[in-house]
């Protein structure tokens, strides 16, 4: 086996590992979405919107506590996760992942434009 053959095999092995990692990640994401869908179906959209509001309030409190030094980063991250789970359910209900992503891209681009204008002053 030549050195080039070895490198070619190594590249294929690395590519295969990347594919396996990506497939594993997709499966985990799919299982998470199935769970979120099951929760949404069980409780219904009205109850889950109320739960989203509750989780947002808890996130605000955790954010205040984190900024003030009276609450931990771990608690703040937990509340972020709670809100993200609820937001994922909303996107599932409205079949709106693509639309939400589009709006997010627009808002990030707009804010970057604002930052650029601020820096030019």
Map each language-model feature to its residues.
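Feature marks short, highly hydrophobic, charge-poor N-terminal signal-anchor/signal peptide-like helices
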Residues: 1-12
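Flexible "arm" and connector segments at domain edges
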Residues: 10-121
